[in-house]
Amino acid sequence: MKKHLIKLLVLILALATGAAVRAASTLDIYWIDMEGGAGTLIVTPAGESVLIDTGNPGGTNTDSSAARIHKAAVAAGISKIDYLITTHFHMDHYGGAADLAALMPIGEVLDNGIPEHDSDGVTNNDARWTRGIQPYRDFKADSRKVMQPGEVIPLKQTSGAAPLSFYCVGTRQRYPIPSYVPTNVTNPVCAEGVEHPVDTTDNANSIVMLLKFGPFKFFVAGDLTWNMEAKLVCPFNPIGTVDLYQVDHHGLNLSNNPLLVRSLSPTVSVMSNGSRKGAMPETLATLRSVPSIQTMWQIHRNTLGGTNFNTDYQYIANLPVQCEGNYIKCSVDPSGKSYTVSIPATGVSKTYATVLDRPY
């Protein structure tokens, strides 16, 4: 009898500990410090996980991209990546995948299809490209699939929580207009656009995703660059406005076209930058010029400058160059009507109301 009681107490404690890891029925998003790479982990109310990009290669040591993703996954209470989305084939976005697969199982991999030649079309670079991509090609996963525009990730719904959907707005420079988007009136901001030189790198092919949780909307587009950002929302905007904007391309000025940011009109932005990469003054100026944005959050302080390179320091997860790899977290209420962004390591947090009166 005593042994059974002890087992019961252990089970109750384990369940209580698991519940403390992630509040029931919240949608949680983690921006993990990839030291200038990208890695965004989404954990659904049903406990499924979606990882967008895996940072750089670096083995499985404590400070590697894979180890930091694994650490965040453990904090989120998950033991498997159900879906891995690789937005494009640059090393700082796919490089940590093979290392991560050595630490935890990976379910379905979705990407643009592994190129046979250099992803940026660089001539005489095929040998180097082949060596660099081989670990990604070889790592173990349950399945692999080429992402298509309009594709929906079949995430599980949860009783008592808002409806959840996650779909591909576009990829490989194709952005179809959904039938519910009105096409009788063009996007008014498009008239003010300025083109940049054509981007021939794989950045321009980045997968663009939109997450909806009830009224809450989150936009993430890898390293999508200037002209493609304009093409995405002009002449028609298939996305509408969003609550949360993952700043494109680490905050570089090759991206974050004002046409895109103004069309999305986010309430919050989160930037996955490095201490000397991204967070460019032009991007910060664009974000500050958008009236809807209440707070700009950053993974790193940009050491190249002061306020023109950075948001308010309290909203930066890692201030020193030699840092602890702190992440930024967003927890969305089960109703989808409010959400809290925080830096758990510093205790800074801020709660926002979701925009409710959108046409779509």
Language-model features: where?
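Flexible, acidic/histidine-containing loops and adjacent segments that form or flank the divalent-metal
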Residues: 24-27, 94-225, 289-360
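Proline-aspartate-enriched helix->loop->beta-strand connector
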Residues: 106, 265-271
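Metallo-beta-lactamase
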Residues: 81-92, 245-249
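Active-site environment of divalent metal-dependent phosphoester hydrolases
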Residues: 36-38, 58-59, 89-95, 115-119, ...
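Bacterial N-terminal signal peptides
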Residues: 7-18
